């Protein structure tokens, strides 16, 4: 009988392989208004995540999300993939997007980079991974989402409430209408039909500790 640690290690390898074989990751570039090619993405088995967070409105210069894959017992493993939902060169008041291989994902960490330090919202860590975080096991992701081949998925707006050093809450709301309306203007390739599929908040891991990391 396989031990739990062996099953987790095997799950990490499978999760990493699924990302490596399934396609590519992408983030917005303010100069790239023609990509992505949805037909090509569908052929590659990839889709597009469109998302917003409450951090977009809190003076963050960058907002990133650390992705994880589900494993045994409802836990999630950091697979070493981070997507940028807001970048310094992104158009104002526009949701972020990422090109991802089709599949199920969890977000285990949201990071706000702003003057004075980084504000980090992280799910509960069960077992630490490597120095760069790959392989870290979390009790449950903060939110989950699903993408199908060739889909533009409107996954909603993740609302994070609570101050650093306190317990914080996670909820999912609609992306503000004004932001959605700006999306096809900023990025013509995303003018097609979106699949509205809001992220889900798991029953476990929906509240964790927030921390402020000082800038080095």
Located regions from the model:
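Sec-dependent bacterial lipoprotein signal peptides
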Residues: 1-24
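Alpha-helical interaction segments
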Residues: 14-15, 95-96, 169, 177
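Primarily secretory-pathway and cell-envelope proteins
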Residues: 25-82, 112-216
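Tryptophan-paired
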Residues: 72-103
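A short tyrosine-centered beta-strand micro-motif
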Residues: 102-110
